């Protein structure tokens, strides 16, 4: 027998049921009881699907209303004072939502907690806020209730909780100036670990045998103080009346191997997709009786698994460990869509290459049966079918485009250089004539139900091309007139034609495919549907020129052309795994270069190439950074360097803690960079104390992820803080991010206030 288990399942539902239920609750259309019922239905369906795949245990604790780290933060009672949590009382669902998004059906609206990327994924977590002397207690019962819920349905359960070291590492606080690795946070372990021990004891009383405790920071560059803390923390949990499976993922243990192997725990999970070479060393270092969970199915991409290769890789460990070798996905399946069975629109050939969360569990079950007994009934036939699908993909004529191959071969000779910034900015100012502290937005405007219905009707054929174009033009004109009315300086067309900043471009590029229900959670209730890059990328025709040139024709003010950058398209897609990511990114850059040149020729003289994902692409280990940054910067410059000096190139980056890569950001040589800084109170600008950023910069002055309207004086204060580090003549005033997810009333109020703040700055 081979034990198979899962680290976590997508929580959103195959049809995004959780998103709809949560948003209906926020808007007052559903009650809390309605929301709880939806949660129970989803959990039951997810547990049943996982059990049907043959898992020994179903995970409990992977479900979350907004974010699993936020769930755990509230269970620990770590609620910042501004949320008014009554001492000793349970943390309510509305308090959780206020921490995540700033407001809820009850409770006073207040500034949300910071949100940032989860390791190098496109998932966002809510950052725990920590203070010296922080107290902890069990302040919510959801974990224990859900364990009993699953048990009542007949399931064997494996609770999943964030580990104490990873939770602390991901936390922040004003007193912890050193960032995520600040060793001062480790002093909180003395009050944190007793609550962990209490949680584990209560789980044991519910009949739980195994608890998965996630410690993915073991794949990072850890300071020695944190390695030492692992040993002392888990020594204090060693007497817990449950077996602990410490789960690591997103990379290899490397120099943390000895630390991980020394932990007094019953099992260790490792990622064999990102770090296949660690299997032998980990297996050899286990203590007698200790379990190794092999993360052998890719939890972050959507391609079918080469089960023959997996079996060959696992064979030595199986021989060494026997049934102490467990099988699992590499990480939580949170990062992939729910079920390929819903993709009836995909052509059969492409569909046969794919595997979503449900299918990955089926692959896992097949792998477990094959490892235990390759002669078991049905195993050989199932492996043969898997083999045939992989062979068909390798041999498909859809994968390679000879024209793209020829252009790639010549790409090293294509210029990446523009005139010096001082020369460019002088020529741009002569052309654009912008005031001090120029105002702009990041690109998108609110996507109303009417706009979404318009696109849906057009795609379904219910609306003609001419009627659709007329309606989109009307919306663009409305957005232009609004921006003129409130006094913005550099306008945007609002992107009403775009459902998503990556999917829109993918639909117009060769080498991409799209799903109908391939949704994954990005943050809170926001889900994205990543395109699939299955083959060589090329641009058959202009993608944005018509809409952007029309918008520019409506006004004398400059209108930005809006593109998504090559690195972000790469990062936010499911990328082919048959060639290096760098090569796919360069194909994207060449396609975008053609679009940039066409926009300039159409009279669009300000062009924004968004790269919000450039930092998330950073390898988790610092030793691997420079190689990535070299090709990422090269791809950006390749996409932007084909225009004249007086065409202004903007780029945008959100949630980007890139203080430590600022030299590479400067090397991108965008004329203007706009960044996310409001939630972190301009924390990013610490980089400029040591580095003199050479070009213009727009530090975001309000958080678009919260519906709260920012105070004018607060925005002025943020900009004055920025001006203390940067020359004021190089500062722009803008929101943190695009306005797509916001409603019009709050958008109008916020932008009017932002323009007022800019005018106050100009007045001194």
Swiss-Prot record:
Enzyme kind, highest EC tier: transferase
One GO term (biological process): methionine biosynthetic process
Entry's EC annotation: 2.1.1.14
Pathway listed: Amino-acid biosynthesis; L-methionine biosynthesis via de novo pathway; L-methionine from L-homocysteine (MetE route): step 1/1
Catalytic activity: 5-methyltetrahydropteroyltri-L-glutamate + L-homocysteine = tetrahydropteroyltri-L-glutamate + L-methionine
Cofactor(s) demanded: Zn(2+)
Cofactor note: Binds 1 zinc ion per subunit.
A single MF term (Gene Ontology): 5-methyltetrahydropteroyltriglutamate-homocysteine S-methyltransferase activity
Keywords: Amino-acid biosynthesis, Metal-binding, Methionine biosynthesis, Methyltransferase, Repeat, Transferase, Zinc
Entry coiled-coil feature ranges: none
Binding site for L-homocysteine: 442-444, 495, 610
Function per UniProt: Catalyzes the transfer of a methyl group from 5-methyltetrahydrofolate to homocysteine resulting in methionine formation.
NCBIfam families membership: met_syn_B12ind (TIGR01371), PRK05222.1 (NF003556)
The protein, known as: 5-methyltetrahydropteroyltriglutamate--homocysteine methyltransferase
Species per Swiss-Prot/TrEMBL record: Bordetella petrii (strain ATCC BAA-461 / DSM 12804 / CCUG 43448)
UniProt gene name: metE
